[in-house]
Amino acid sequence: MADEMSEPRRVGFVGAGRMAEAIAQGLIRAGKVEAKQVLASAPTDKNLCHFRALGCQTTHSNHEVLQNCPLVIFATKPQVLPAVLAEVAPVVTTEHIIVSVAAGISLSSMEELLPPKTRVLRVSPNLPCVVQEGAMVMTRGHHAGNEDAKLLQNLLEACGQCIEVPESYVDIHTGLSGSGVAFVCTFSEALAEGAIKMGMPSDLAHRIAAQTLLGTAKMLQQEGKHPAQLRTDVLTPAGTTIHGLHALEQGGFRAAAMSAVEAATCRAKELSKK
């Protein structure tokens, strides 16, 4: 099965929302799988139309997806995933690789709902997967092997960065990167509004703020510098940047950002226990 799965002929999606569409789009654009070899299911046509627009096959039957695809990504809402797994369990075999992108549902919970020795993996994505710049982590269950993990990682790198981690890191990733998208957007908005206050037109301010975040992120990735080092590179004695940083420190910016990640992580852990 390992040779067959090295390049899966068919990839299935149970659930066809925005994240499922983003992952499918990334796989197709990167040439990881042909559009006609993607099969997605959902209860209604509301989201399936987006998959059809990509050239994918669609169905209202979850069983049909499992019966036709060796690798199936479950992208349902977390509250319905247990019921969906219980529904498809009769058609799941040890030949399947089952992947969940639903938040708050542990590997052990999924394994309990599926047949013995089912190969299960869990992925925590974030919204930039929509533009193939996601920051994802993945973790595997008891019966998923190295080849399964490598296969999934290779596929998902079409949607951004995908790193294998212990499951205990998944909730932290939710606080850092899943919720972090909103934190970064809030910072970008605040930067732009500062410029607007000083007289810059709104559209221009927001464009420049977004590009500043993008350029800074690329420098951090490509140069491999610690953020503190890059920040220091911008500083000049008695210059504009140190005055601005002083204002951020007076406002408790650093502590607020740390507390935001902590609060979001704690909430993710609470939801995982329910």
Curated annotation (Swiss-Prot):
Its main location: cytoplasm. It is found in: Cytoplasm. GO terms for molecular function: pyrroline-5-carboxylate reductase activity. Disulfide bonds: none annotated. It catalyses: L-proline + NADP(+) = (S)-1-pyrroline-5-carboxylate + NADPH + 2 H(+); L-proline + NAD(+) = (S)-1-pyrroline-5-carboxylate + NADH + 2 H(+). Its EC number is 1.5.1.2. Homodecamer; composed of 5 homodimers. This is Pyrroline-5-carboxylate reductase 3. It comes from Rattus norvegicus (Rat). The lineage of its organism: Eukaryota, Metazoa, Chordata, Craniata, Vertebrata. The gene is Pycr3.
